[in-house]
Amino acid sequence: RVSSDLTVIAHDGVTKQTYTIQKAVPDKIPYGYRKGSETELFKLDMGVIGLPWTGANAPSLAVSGNNLVVCLGDGTTTPAYYNASTGNKIGNVTLGSVSVASLGCMTSDSRGNILLATKATNGKSFSIYKTSSVTTAPTLLTTYTNNTGLDMGTKVSVQGDINTNASIIATCDGTASSGSNKFVRWIITDGVLGSPQVVTVNGVGNWGAPASNTKVVTKGTTAQSDYFLSYYDSNILYWVNGTNNNASKSLEDSDNGNSWAMNNNCLDTRSFNNAQYLVLVCTAHFP
């Protein structure tokens, strides 16, 4: 703890007051965040800032440093990044060899590394690129021939640090002819990327194409880690046992009609100050 005195003299040159200034590390709670400390930083109208909503949109977010990345996934709009504290636009994300037309979504890991995923119908090539900065051209992390019988690329999640230990999950979207209860997962262990695993989830029914699909998010960085999902229009938050992939309802009341016209498919998990958090954003399905 360091302290010093500061004397302030008034405009009359006589009146004065001495203050003691101390530099110290504040006390920190041992678990999670302090309830009531939430602060709304900004509120943006997407149309006003040049990100209009269309039926082709499949939006996703990423965070790297103090940069908030917004990717519309519409095939035409270059992802942009904003000051995460003020909401002011800074610039467009450097994509390098990744084309806007192929880009499906973006996400980020616990260390601020960004993943960019391409769209892939059944039988086509699905790619994940990585970068450590919004201004550094991404490099290829992996390519996978999509043999799931479904579409991929609109929702990808990551838990952990892709340079050490992480779990990457790409949702398989439903199509016009088939619903989906599958995702593809990659496990990174000690910086080494493992083989893709196609996983079928038991007891969740079937989700559809965007915007009726789900983002599958996991608690940990192993193949046995439990995970969560929720999709329109059942809007049920499922907790899934990572060992047997059997689902249980985490919010049973959401299937009694109370969630009509809502779309509860925006979710993520994060660790903070020794606590694990699940975030579920409940939005209106109809404009």
Where on the chain are the PLM-derived regions?
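Beta-rich interaction/scaffold domains
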Residues: 1-33
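Beta-propeller fold detector
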Residues: 30-48, 88-98, 135-148, 192-205, ...
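Beta-strand-rich domains and repeat architectures in extracellular enzymes and scaffolds
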Residues: 43-77
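Asp-box/WD-like beta-propeller blade repeats and closely related beta-sheet repeat scaffolds
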Residues: 119-178
